[in-house]
């Protein structure tokens, strides 16, 4: 988890989605695609330690004068229960089905801005070694059922993994869980946001 994502936002996140190497291609009409993992705090109202991840895919498109391609890493902080449950549906369009915004950056960045307080999801990206807030508005985030089946050896939904704890975290997820439990062990959200 990058150092320039404000610690107070990490501590208040109910879930985190990590999407490494999202591919962006553009020749007049652009598109992006990537796969990654969503991991949530366990227990009632997401107050426990980090649990087993569910696999997700990000897809997006745009039109404009553009040429080229690149790979970008994304970290999405899901800031409340409503945002978490929206993402766990079959698919969610960021900005339409869930309020998304580019997250503030820097250790001293304040989390009290209007954009941050209204957003259900804050997005960060890294290209060429630099992490910054970026908007993913208009992109679609959906469960990657095939990847979940491959990871857990059976069909299991994101809701069953993240909310109901129906599967144990696989060995491949232990490093991410350990990093998150070390970096942000407790949910410090306002109790009102957890309802």
Model-derived features: where do they sit?
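Small-residue-enriched, tightly packed secondary-structure blocks
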Residues: 1-195
